[in-house]
UniProtKB/Swiss-Prot annotation:
Species this chain originates from: Pseudomonas phage PaMx41
Disruption phenotype: No change in virus replication in host (strain Pa011).
Biological function: A naturally occurring inactive form of this protein. Upon mutation by a single nucleotide change (changes the stop codon to Gln) inhibits CBASS immunity; most closely related viruses encode a long version of this protein. The long (mutated) version antagonizes the effector protein of host type II-A CBASS immunity by binding the second messenger 3',3'-cyclic GMP-AMP (cGAMP) and sequestering it (thus preventing host CapV activation) without degrading the cyclic nucleotide. The mutated version also antagonizes the effector protein of P.aeruginosa type I-A and type I-B CBASS systems.
Protein name: Inactive anti-CBASS 2 protein
Family affiliation: Belongs to the Acb2 family.
Amino acid sequence: MDNQHKKIKGYRDLSQEEIDMMNRVKELGSQFEKLI
């Protein structure tokens, strides 16, 4: 099922910078979860 997002209209590949930012947000989210 690789690249199935390419079949969905309007979807595009993310840049490495966008992927890095998303991973950072997920990382911060798990840290916030520990604080609560």
